[in-house]
Amino acid sequence: NMAVNEAFIDSATVRENVVSLARNIGYVPRSRRAAIAKINFTVDVSSLAARYVTLNAGIVALGNIQNGSYTFSIPEKITVSPGSNGIASFENIEIFEGNYLTKEFIVNTGQLDAKYILPNTNIDTTTIRVSVTDGDTGTVEVYNAYENIFQVNSESRLFLVQEVNDEKYQILFGDGVLGKKPPNGSTIKVSYIVTNGTDGNGASNFNFAGNLAYPRRSGDTIVDTPVTQNVSLLTVPQPSENGDNIEPVDNVKYLAPRVYASQYRAVTANDYTSLVPSVYPNIDSVTAYGGEELDPPQFGKVFITVKPKTGELLSDTAKSAIKAGLKQYTVAGIQQEFVDLKFLYVEYDSTVSYNPGFITNKEDLSSR
């Protein structure tokens, strides 16, 4: 009976089986998500005559939360040109809670069933970056995450991510017809951030620990030279938030068939109810309805109400993030508007009837 139960998404209980069944209908369960904070800082390079300053990928800051200190990183480098005063300003830099790691694979086309599986769990798949270095020419090509079939041809440098056993992730590439196939002997470099999920939420005090560099001429070559001084204190316009754990099995079983029914197109209100939780993790419940249901009707609009897991109302930043995530699914002519929740608090008085023969002291009622 158990074997039969595990063959259907409604009755399966083992995560690997549920994920595999969801994959058959095109649903990729959400990975663990890193808490994201925004920081500002400046670097004075007036004495270095630097044309630009680069904040390299990897650790950027250490954030303090009540339950300890956490590492915050960025998945790719950020380059800023200094102003006329020689000061480079890094503003609203998004930093992700977690450790930045890399893994390399050598392509061997003679191996029929080659698999590129990342060895770590707790990866935030949105931070995965992939590049391929040609073994003959040394040319480096950046591969981007697959979004939809319309962008794919034989030269499309794209990769797919799918969850495999033990909550690890496999990187998939094209076959030379649908997506470019990495050439034999090339080196695949995958970088990603391993995160603590919800534990990283709430950091608002950061100490800089990043790696800054600027280009300096040395003979006939340009070398990256570290910048170790004149870095300002960090300011934090947004504390870390929206960290979440991997999508639970029950959620996968609920959302997978509904997202499949929407065909990844946000057209009806039910489509939005299914797609919003898949693009934004910090959601307890969501309701959507079309403007045609209002009096007077507001055609061409869909209204979305979200109850977040933390707090009572969505922030403007969260609303913008959801809209950005939905953009790839929406159709032209439909506007999304968020409606804040209204809470109804009820206070009540009660009258209790009891038999004095069983309870001699009415004060004892409070323990019954």
Regions found by a protein language model. Give the residues of each.
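Acidic, glycine-rich low-complexity/disordered segments
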Residues: 80-138, 170, 180-266, 331-368
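Extracellular/luminal ectodomains and secreted, surface-exposed scaffolds of diverse proteins
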Residues: 127-174, 178-181
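Extended assembly-interface regions of large multimeric machines
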Residues: 1-124
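A generic structural motif
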Residues: 68, 76, 87, 169-173, ...
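Short, well-structured beta-strand/strand-turn elements
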Residues: 63-73, 136-142, 274-294
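Carbohydrate-recognition loop of C-type lectin domains
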Residues: 263-368
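Solvent-exposed coil/turn segments that connect beta secondary-structure elements
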Residues: 44, 77, 193, 307-309, ...
